[in-house]
């Protein structure tokens, strides 16, 4: 399926937006505020369904490293708030899938395709995975690589006047959010 061909497949960004899993962050926050396990059950249901329908590196949800990065960042928040309440088998699978996101990012960085805001988001996610999961085999590499890329992007994307080089308020806000993260 030529999923990046708008004329043949429609707007792939609609699919990507849903698959950033920002709604799972909201479910995790709802659980954190209420302790209502229905929110956790819904997270598990969504995650298991997603894993089944989106095997590692197959399909539209693996076509953009930036989208993989956004999803990884969402999953990090979900894990941070709910990981201690996950069943052991689900938790193990969750961490395996999150690790795969890191592998995908490491080997598919947008260095040549879109080495600006895309690369920045990917680098932030890679760095976060390296810092927050220090026991993983590639953590130290991800931490160093991600941090180095973030610092490089800070130098190349921020002008002397402090504004983002694309002169877009949206990209300025996006880059600032990523640098702060």
Task: Tell where the protein language model's regions lie, with residue ranges.
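Aromatic-lined, polymer-binding surfaces characteristic
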Residues: 4, 9-181
């Amino acid at each position: 399926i030529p999923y990046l061909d708008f004329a043949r497949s429609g707007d792939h960004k609609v699919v990507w937006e849903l698959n950033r899993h920002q709604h799972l962050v909201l479910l995790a926050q709802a659980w954190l505020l209420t302790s209502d396990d229905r929110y956790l059950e819904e997270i598990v249901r969504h995650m298991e369904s997603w894993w089944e329908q989106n095997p590692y590196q197959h399909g539209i949800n693996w076509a953009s490293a930036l989208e993989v990065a956004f999803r990884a960042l969402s999953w990090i928040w979900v894990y941070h708030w709910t990981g201690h309440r996950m069943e052991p088998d689900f938790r193990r699978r969750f961490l395996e899938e999150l690790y795969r996101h890191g592998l995908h990012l490491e080997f598919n960085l947008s260095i040549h395709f879109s080495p600006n805001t895309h690369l920045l988001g990917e680098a932030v996610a890679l760095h976060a995975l390296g810092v927050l999961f220090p026991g993983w085999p590639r953590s130290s590499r991800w931490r160093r690589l991600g941090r180095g890329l973030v610092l490089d992007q800070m130098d190349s994307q921020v002008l002397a006047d402090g504004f983002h080089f694309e002169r877009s308020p949206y990209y300025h806000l996006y880059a600032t959010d990523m640098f702060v993260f």
